Amino acid sequence: MKPGIHPEYGKARVICACGETFETGSTKKEIRVEICSKCHPFYTGSQRTVEARGRAEQFKKKYGL
């Protein structure tokens, strides 16, 4: 590696929108994220599933068929 051309790699503080902070390695000092493992639905278990009904199912439900 050539000396003097690579950015400094050090500890970086990651700040989530939910308020959680943790440290990782990066060339930046501070990283802001919108979602992390503390607030992501997959990790918290609050994941919702969306049921999409087709037009035929809606018709059957509406008219009791």
UniProtKB/Swiss-Prot annotation:
Cofactor entry: Zn(2+)
A GO term for molecular function: metal ion binding
PROSITE patterns attached to this UniProt entry: RIBOSOMAL_L31
InterPro entries linked to this entry: Ribosomal_bL28/bL31-like_sf (IPR034704), Ribosomal_bL31 (IPR002150), Ribosomal_bL31_A (IPR027491), Ribosomal_bL31_sf (IPR042105)
Positions annotated to bind Zn(2+): C16, C18, C36, C39
Gene3D superfamilies in UniProt: Ribosomal protein L31
Key words of the record: Metal-binding, Ribonucleoprotein, Ribosomal protein, RNA-binding, rRNA-binding, Zinc
A single GO cellular-component term on record: ribonucleoprotein complex
Pfam families to which the protein is assigned, alphabetical: Ribosomal_L31 (PF01197)
Function comment: Binds the 23S rRNA.
Oligomer and partners: Part of the 50S ribosomal subunit.
Protein name, per record: Large ribosomal subunit protein bL31
Originating organism: Carboxydothermus hydrogenoformans (strain ATCC BAA-161 / DSM 6008 / Z-2901)
Gene name tied to this protein: rpmE
